[in-house]
């Protein structure tokens, strides 16, 4: 398969992966309306073309929390990344480091913190869920500190799991799921060898280290379901703010009032996110939610955004709408599944090229030059 654009990796991943894994990363909740709107609404944002400007010194570099980024992108936390390529978290982290951007590790990664952190020199970021098991939360935060993690990304939009109907049909869950996954793996021998056999252990590494015993993937849904905490409030986050020395980012903000609460709480950043359309279907796309949030809190903290970003042009659109930096989730996992770490590197090269074209033709020589003036209209 020819990869000529960043969006080509989705088809490549679909061809290589067993359906239960492809649809797990590709799908959304309920009728997947928000999932679709994320990409559609962002694609409708019209860039303002400007010409006859000297763009010879164009730069994509930016700085977040004192950390230099080669471009305003970080790899987002994605659960089970290690099921998409052999020791996938390690491969993705190395690719991000090589391209000069941060890698964010998920709480529910296959590889544990202690495996990924030593594989790279650049400090990684770490994502944590709000869980009933506060002992686990404290344990994993202590381990993240010891591993040199700089930035904590705290996910707050999963007090309960979203209803992802596609998973029931694909074999990720539902009747006879384990048997269905085995049959699917047999029909995808490349994945079965590279990940199914050579990528073991298939553990939830961070959880297994805490529990002192292997955590099979079959335990994934059950453990998370039992530990989501719908009682969580801003007050419950205070001990984490006190415990964590570095920057703390609140992920899952879609409303300007919640963004203002994050400022009052003392967060260093927020992620404008609807969890990639995987939680509450029917909410705003991030492209629609971002402008009013940026109007409310821009300059008070760093604004990240995810959900629906598939190209370098999309990154430029999000920055023009008010974001300081973007997070890539599905996009990098598609590339990882298709071509491993080399695929992620190539994907980021494609994003780089796409951003440079968009910025050249909008007259933005630096990331700071991107603003609402770079758009024809705000959707």
UniProtKB/Swiss-Prot annotation:
CDD domains: alpha_hydroxyacid_oxid_FMN. It is found in: Cell inner membrane. Keywords: Cell inner membrane, Cell membrane, Flavoprotein, FMN, Membrane, Oxidoreductase. The keyword Transport does not apply. Substrate binds at residues 24, 129, 164, 278. It is a peripheral membrane protein. GO terms for molecular function: FMN binding; L-lactate dehydrogenase activity. Its cofactor is FMN. GO terms for biological process: aerobic respiration; lactate metabolic process. Catalyzes the conversion of L-lactate to pyruvate. Is coupled to the respiratory chain. This is L-lactate dehydrogenase. It comes from Vibrio parahaemolyticus serotype O3:K6 (strain RIMD 2210633). The lineage of its organism: Bacteria, Pseudomonadati, Pseudomonadota, Gammaproteobacteria, Vibrionales.
């Amino acid at each position: 398969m020819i990869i000529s654009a960043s969006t080509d990796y989705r088809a490549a991943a679909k061809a290589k992966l067993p359906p239960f894994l492809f649809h797990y990363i590709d799908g959304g909740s309920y009728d997947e309306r928000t999932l679709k709107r994320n990409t559609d609404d962002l694609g409708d944002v019209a860039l303002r073309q400007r010409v006859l400007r000297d763009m010879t010194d164009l730069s994509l570099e930016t700085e977040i929390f004192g950390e230099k980024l080669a471009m305003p992108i970080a790899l987002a936390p994605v659960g089970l990344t290690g099921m998409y390529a052999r020791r996938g978290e390690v491969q993705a982290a190395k690719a991000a480091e090589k391209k000069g951007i941060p890698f964010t590790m998920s709480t529910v990664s296959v590889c544990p913190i202690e495996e990924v952190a030593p594989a790279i020199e650049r400090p990684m970021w770490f994502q944590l869920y709000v869980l009933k098991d506060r002992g686990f939360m404290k344990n994993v935060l202590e381990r993240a500190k010891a591993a040199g993690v700089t930035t904590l990304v705290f996910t707050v939009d999963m007090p309960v799991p979203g209803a992802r109907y596609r998973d029931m049909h694909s074999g990720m869950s539902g009747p006879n799921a384990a048997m269905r996954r085995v049959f699917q793996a047999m029909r995808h021998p490349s994945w079965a060898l590279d990940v199914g056999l050579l990528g073991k252990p298939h553990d939830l590494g961070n959880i297994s280290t805490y529990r002192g015993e292997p955590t099979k993937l079959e335990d994934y849904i059950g453990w998370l379901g039992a530990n989501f905490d719908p009682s969580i409030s801003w007050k419950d986050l205070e001990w984490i703010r006190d415990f964590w020395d570095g920057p703390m980012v609140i992920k899952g903000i879609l409303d300007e009032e919640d963004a203002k609460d994050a400022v009052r709480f003392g967060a260093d950043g927020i992620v404008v996110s609807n969890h990639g359309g995987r939680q509450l279907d029917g909410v705003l796309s991030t492209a629609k939610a971002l402008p009013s949030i940026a109007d409310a809190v821009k300059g008070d903290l760093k604004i990240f955004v995810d959900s629906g970003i598939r190209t370098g042009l999309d990154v430029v659109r999000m920055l023009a709408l008010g974001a300081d930096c973007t997070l890539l989730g599905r996009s990098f996992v598609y590339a990882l599944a298709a071509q491993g770490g080399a695929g992620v590197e190539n994907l980021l090269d494609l994003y780089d090229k796409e951003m440079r074209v968009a910025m050249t033709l909008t007259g933005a020589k630096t990331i700071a030059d991107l603003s609402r003036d770079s758009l024809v209209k705000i959707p």
